């Protein structure tokens, strides 16, 4: 079964520490997962239910109980996976490489689509979640180089959903960078006080 094989393969290859990070990983492969809780004959149980999704994340077809895919896809195994992933990521400092790459790309552009595509070229997929008003409320990075799924806020507040939302909606977001020959005060007038200091204007951030 394609869904089961994909779920098992992803569980073996990637590290994730929360259900949200697990869901972000699955979304790259048009799948999602939800927790199922209930009571059978007086005993409480926790389970996971997997679904196939369309490109907009809407569930299609019937859901699959995790028991169809074997123990590794079940609730208890995934909870253990969270704990194991946390210690591996911490002990081996696996988030550092991802953070460096994401920050370097972020500092190079205010264009969200360019940010996502440049990260993809470097081996990192970005999953952004939006409110109905179109604001970013969640950002997760899947680093295929290290096999880690990381919420932006886990790597620092400068990569949190709020910080990214602000970065991509600055007055000059989506605009070509200021020509480097413009003196600082002219640049300030052009944009209302920008957040640049003189070093940045002279090309310190290497914007393109």
Predicted regions and their residues:
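Extended intrinsically disordered terminal tails
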Residues: 1-208
